[in-house]
Regions:
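Conserved non-catalytic scaffold segment of RNase H-like nuclease domains
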Residues: 1-112, 163
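Substrate-recognition/cap helix-loop segment adjacent to the acidic, metal-dependent catalytic center
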Residues: 118-138
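Glycine-rich, phosphate-binding/catalytic loops in enzymes
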Residues: 29-33, 126-129, 179
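Active-site-proximal helix-loop-helix substrate-binding element of RNase H-like nuclease domains
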Residues: 54-70, 74-77, 143-180
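Generic detector of well-ordered alpha-helical packing
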Residues: 17-19, 32, 118, 143, ...
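Acidic, Mg2+-coordinating catalytic module of metal-dependent nucleases/exonucleases
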Residues: 108-115, 119-120, 124-125, 157-195
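Conserved protein kinase catalytic core
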Residues: 22-24, 148, 184
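Residue-level recognition of the N-termini of beta-strands and the immediately preceding loop/turn
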Residues: 105-108, 135-139
């Protein structure tokens, strides 16, 4: 289980975002979490969770329906939200270290409906001028697609159930929880089909 050969030198890292809408250019990024999937005894395993609550950027759109869906109140001071640039540093710097620690050249984003998470991450990186983004700019692994193939279901909660993994609906729609659970799903799929 060598990430330099198993994934062509890319460290798989699950990213999950919670947002205030579907438009990565105009809607606020509210939470960001990343979980490297690392080799260990018996296969691949979720690593440490790196997370940050994010302050909406100036002029960001906040769709009421999205806020209701996630249950996030962007104005809640108890969230401990950071400006986007600081949140990116908080989450992505440990990922850069993990990439180096595993002798990889970059991270490859893993996500459930990965294009959504990738688009919001890239928009925040571009908006803030964040330097040294550890992720490949466009390649990713999508666990919705992988779970559809492996377990016959693309909905995260149902895929987790079919994979025999724990899922708590009460904790869902938290970037940290969803990222950690998606990392467990990805690791299970990789361990099942690791060659």
């Amino acid at each position: 289980m060598d990430p330099t050969t198993r994934f062509r030198g890319y460290l798989p890292v699950v990213v999950d975002v919670e947002t205030a809408g579907f438009n990565p250019q105009g809607d606020a990024l509210l939470e960001l979490a990343a979980v490297p999937v690392v080799p260990g005894e018996g296969g691949w395993h979720p690593g440490a969770v790196h997370e940050a609550a994010v302050e909406p950027f100036p002029g960001a759109n906040l769709e009421e329906s999205a806020l209701k869906f996630t249950g996030i109140d962007p104005e809640d001071p108890l969230r401990g939200a950071l400006p986007e640039a600081e949140a990116l540093t908080e989450v992505l710097n440990p990922i850069r270290r993990a990439v180096a620690d595993h002798d990889c050249k970059r991270a490859i984003l893993v996500g459930h409906n990965a294009a959504f998470d990738h688009a919001f991450l890239n928009a925040a990186v571009n908006r803030t001028g964040f330097k040294r983004n550890p992720f490949h700019p466009f390649s990713s692994f999508d666990t919705a697609t992988l779970a559809g193939l492996a377990y016959g279901h693309t909905v995260l909660a149902r895929a987790m159930e079919r994979a025999g993994l724990e899922w708590d609906d009460e904790r869902a729609h938290s970037a940290a929880y969803d990222a950690e659970r998606t990392a467990a799903l990805f690791a299970t799929i990789v361990n099942t089909w690791d060659h």
